Amino acid sequence: MAAFSEMGVMPEIAQAVEEMDWLLPTDIQAESIPLILGGGDVLMAAETGSGKTGAFSIPVIQIVYETLKDQQEGKKGKTTIKTGASVLNKWQMNPYDRGSAFAIGSDGLCCQSREVKEWHGCRATKGLMKGKHYYEVSCHDQGLCRVGWSTMQASLDLGTDKFGFGFGGTGKKSHNKQFDNYGEEFTMHDTIGCYLDIDKGHVKFSKNGKDLGLAFEIPPHMKNQALFPACVLKNAELKFNFGEEEFKFPPKDGFVALSKAPDGYIVKSQHSGNAQVTQTKFLPNAPKALIVEPSRELAEQTLNNIKQFKKYIDNPKLRELLIIGGVAARDQLSVLENGVDIVVGTPGRLDDLVSTGKLNLSQVRFLVLDEADGLLTQGYSDFINRMHNQIPQVTSDGKRLQVIVCSATLHSFDVKKLSEKIMHFPTWVDLKGEDSVPDTVHHVVVPVNPKTDRLWERLGKNHIRTDDVHAKDNTRPGANSPEMWSEAIKILKGEYAVRAIKEHKMDQAIIFCRTKIDCDNLEQYFMQQGGGPDKKGHQFSCVCLHGDRKPHERKQNLERFKKGDVRFLICTDVAARGIDIHGVPYVINVTLPDEKQNYVHRIGRVGRAERMGLAISLVATEKEKVWYHVCSSRGKGCYNTRLKEDGGCTIWYNEMQLLSEIEEHLNCTISQVEPDIKVPVDEFDGKVTYGQKRAAGGGSYKGHVDILAPTVQELAALEKEAQTSFLHLGYLPNQLFRTF
């Protein structure tokens, strides 16, 4: 409890955490919880099972509670960026007059846009009608920018209409889409001075104190309009100085800092943010936090964690809601009407409720994207952007929207692009590093070679049903065609899966198949062996987990596997991401995953908490023709076996190439075993019982001691000799000194 309390976690949550036997925070929790409690946006990556859910759930629960408590007591809270009309009382960049990807720091002066393809601009909170005025801009990086002045009528893309005057880093001045050479280029570490003499109608600029001369004469139609400091950025960061701090290059010739301008010269921005700030009025269907998960299983798991963490929170109590498909919408709407504070959901149903106005996003303070790489892979980037655009960037109590992104692969291009677009100066917490296999996991490859193992020819019809990719092909023995070898691979993989279970006497395993039809076929084959969903305790008792199974069945199947009612969970990669299954002794990859990162996710199911685990991958030595649906039905009722490039829904799958990519990714060579699937005993570990902890001190400890014992004894003798020699050398000079 004390460990979590030291990070600022409230006692009620710390008590609940202690009851869960979380004595110390994990690394990801220790790094992320203080950052989120401090109000920052966080990008986090850590291994599955490292406590990522707790890392974002605990601070989200606490801040939502504190927000509700403040509202209950009538407090408005402290603000980092002032809101409403009060924001206009200070010279700063205006959070209510900016582009969608333009971020403003809490001081209102540091600005950033990380959109690499589009320009995003912003204007200040105040403008000027009279006098000679000056402000400075410092460039913090090498991105593109234009700075200058514009009226309230001007586009935020400074210099592209007749109401704005800009000076860009490429050495061009711009007005009304006319770009002319002016001054010189500027970039990182340069300071640009922006001069405005309204009385004479002149605009000019300086670079690092060097006057670049007259840039623009203000046309007559603009002389009665206030001019506001403005900028536009493309993947750049700037910091403004309106005179509150000492200028690097103070102006001359009577120009004064904007912050020193007389009140009679100043005009406040019309964009006060009143329409964009969340209303204090209570809206039952407007949650304070929204957590988006890629699958219903992860959503349910996260909701259960939230229920545990908030166990002792009272007055006010927090109300949570799970919004997922497959559940009657009227039940969810009923809960929404009664009020909700935290929503956890999957994109499909969330999109439905948001688009119909049933779920109001106007009071969201936290947006959490869990397994963001999975969400993007499933094609939900547009949904995320639409949702983010509907959430106010600043709430009524002056708090900024916090965005938290969790991802297995933070450094992927898509995740980086998303973070640049929707996050505000995020802190990266990457404890995952390069993918690696824990030393508690043995992983081996079983080559499936239909040319050397002719078992498939002798089985007749007593084999696993295949996926009908070759329903129209001649796959009879003797055809010697790629289609024949492909069909043979499918048959052999069913046999090898059964053989692996028997050889290792597996009592629990997760079996990964590539497609939903492969899962169904393997389940049917296990039923032919006497097992199946209803055969509790049977050697081949199993359940399926994939998207085509009904929601209640998926939930029930997962629970039955966790409780040990069945031995095998046959699933697609939906179960590889974050589902809370610990200590599974075995994993079988019937087919290698399309993406090399998913290999680590899959085998990460075993070997947790010092328990030994074995992952067996069945890898075809020949290409296998598999389904790859690009049709609108996503495979339902589709029998188009032509190749994708010919307008069909199949591809040739090269597992040997995938294996090579996985080995390169992990920087190791994965051991191969014979088709009998006998795994050789490790030299140090000796006989291993998968699913159980290593012997005390680690399985390899005793073997190492025996080997190193003679060397240690020799080192001890040498150390004794060296110490004795040192003492003699120190003693003799003293004796000689005394003699004289």
Swiss-Prot record:
Where is the stretch described as Necessary for interaction with RELA?
Answer: 1-525
Known role = Acts as an ATP-dependent RNA helicase, able to unwind both RNA-RNA and RNA-DNA duplexes. Possesses 5' single-stranded RNA overhang nuclease activity. Possesses ATPase activity on various RNA, but not DNA polynucleotides. May play a role in RNA clearance at DNA double-strand breaks (DSBs), thereby facilitating the template-guided repair of transcriptionally active regions of the genome. Together with RELA, acts as a coactivator to enhance NF-kappa-B-mediated transcriptional activation. Acts as a positive transcriptional regulator of cyclin CCND2 expression.
Q: Name one GO cellular component term.
A: cytoplasm
Give residue numbers for sequence motif DEAD box. Answer: 370-373
| Residue ranges occupied by any Helicase ATP-binding domain in the UniProt entry | 2-428
Give the family, as the similarity comment puts it: Belongs to the DEAD box helicase family. DDX1 subfamily.
Q: How is the subunit organization of this protein annotated in UniProt?
A: Found in a multi-helicase-TICAM1 complex at least composed of DHX36, DDX1, DDX21 and TICAM1; this complex exists in resting cells with or without poly(I:C) RNA ligand stimulation. Interacts with DHX36. Interacts (via B30.2/SPRY domain) with DDX21 (via N-terminus); this interaction serves as bridges to TICAM1. Interacts with FAM98A (via N- and C-terminus). Interacts with PHF5A (via C-terminus). Interacts with MBNL1. Interacts with CSTF2. Interacts with HNRNPK. Interacts with ATM. Interacts with RELA (via C-terminus). Component of the tRNA-splicing ligase complex. Interacts with PQBP1.
Report disulfide bridges, numbered on this chain. Answer: none
Q: Where in the cell is it found?
A: Nucleus; Cytoplasm; Cytoplasmic granule; Cytoplasm, Cytosol
Q: Which parts of the chain span the membrane according to its record?
A: none
Tell me which UniProt keywords the record has, alphabetically: Acetylation, Activator, Antiviral defense, ATP-binding, Cytoplasm, DNA-binding, Exonuclease, Helicase, Hydrolase, Immunity, Innate immunity, Isopeptide bond, Mitochondrion, mRNA processing, Nuclease, Nucleotide-binding, Nucleus, Phosphoprotein, RNA-binding, Transcription, Transcription regulation, tRNA processing, Ubl conjugation
Boundaries of each Helicase C-terminal domain copy?
A: 493-681
Which portions of the sequence form the region Interaction with dsRNA? 1-448
| Molecular function per GO | ATP binding; ATP hydrolysis activity; chromatin binding; DNA binding; DNA/RNA helicase activity; double-stranded RNA binding; exonuclease activity; nuclease activity
User: SMART domains recorded for this chain?
Assistant: DEXDc, HELICc, SPRY
Question: What domain of life does the native source organism fall in?
Answer: Eukaryota
Q: What is the enzyme's class at the highest EC level?
A: hydrolase
Free-text domain note: The helicase domain is involved in the stimulation of RELA transcriptional activity.
Q: Where is this region: Necessary for interaction with HNRNPK?
A: 1-295, 525-740
Q: Which residues bind ATP?
A: A46, E47, T48, G49, S50, G51, K52, T53
Q: What is this protein called?
A: ATP-dependent RNA helicase DDX1
Q: Which residues carry this modification: N6-acetyllysine?
A: K239, K268, K281
Q: What is its EC number?
A: 3.6.4.13
- Quick check: keyword Glycosyltransferase in the entry? no
Which reaction(s) does the protein catalyse, per the Swiss-Prot or TrEMBL entry?
Answer: ATP + H2O = ADP + phosphate + H(+)
Q: How is it modified after translation?
A: Phosphorylated by ATM kinase; phosphorylation is increased in response to ionizing radiation (IR).
